[in-house]
């Protein structure tokens, strides 16, 4: 998690800085803002910040007048043993005279001052954030306060499996943190139209962002079924979660994602410990999903294409809810993976030429049925008009 401190007494400038951070995926409480020297120093005693964004002209306290060398006085104090020195310091001023006067002081400690009216400071912040994220991915040994497991169900269900899995996990480890994410019951008809579930997707993104804020030092693990896999993977792919949280194990089962989904980019972005994709080779709902629903697929039946050592497809001789209805499945496959990092291979597919032909025909259906329906609708519309 990146920690940034802003010490800036001008409200408009402070808002501009915060907006730059937000655009670069840094959200509260990853950054803290103060408008005076004293509050800033108090935070510097308690927290090791990655970046300090420092105005030059600052008041000692909120109710006092700004001092020309207020920001510079903080620099002098940072060498004391009772302060946690930030990794990077970015000076900022709207006064050219102060920029010229104190530029050498900042350069002497290998940092820079920027003119507020020049966009260079925003680019500098963006570059520092990207550098810190890259450094953390490469060198950070993750030692989170705790593991959190997020369980997300699919459509047309109340998610009973979430309760069953929670019970098994807590029997093994009573203090494990489990969060069962729920959303309104969706019918198969509702899932046909993307605009009907946009709010659910947005709510899930907000939930995960808030989770990273509430547990900034935890590792997030996800176990998702059916449409829940769509929520999980798209949130991790499209948001900036990895800037504020560590991602651990991900189990996807009965996934409605497309088999050619760009999982490689997700893995590169989030650096999960391992993604396991559980497939039911008799999952008929996914055949319909892949055929009739725009934007969805049957990765929970055919697996994800491509290769990554951090992505494993497992194939079972079962249907859409096989992973919950098959007696002992969770105990045999999930608990060893969750608690002991033991991944058990399984491939229940019948690799025959006839089966390959059937799979090829299934894969062609979306390219025939969806365009065909569109053509029929267009013809009906034309006939109705003329």
Curated annotation (Swiss-Prot):
Keyword check for Protease: no
Domain (Response regulatory) ranges: 3-129
UniProt keyword list: Antiviral defense, Cell membrane, Hydrolase, Membrane, Phosphoprotein, Transmembrane, Transmembrane helix, Two-component regulatory system
Protein name: Detocs response regulatory AB hydrolase DtcC
Modification note: Probably phosphorylated by DtcA.
Organism: Enterobacter cloacae (strain JD6301)
TM annotation in the entry: 362-382
Location of the protein in the cell: Cell membrane
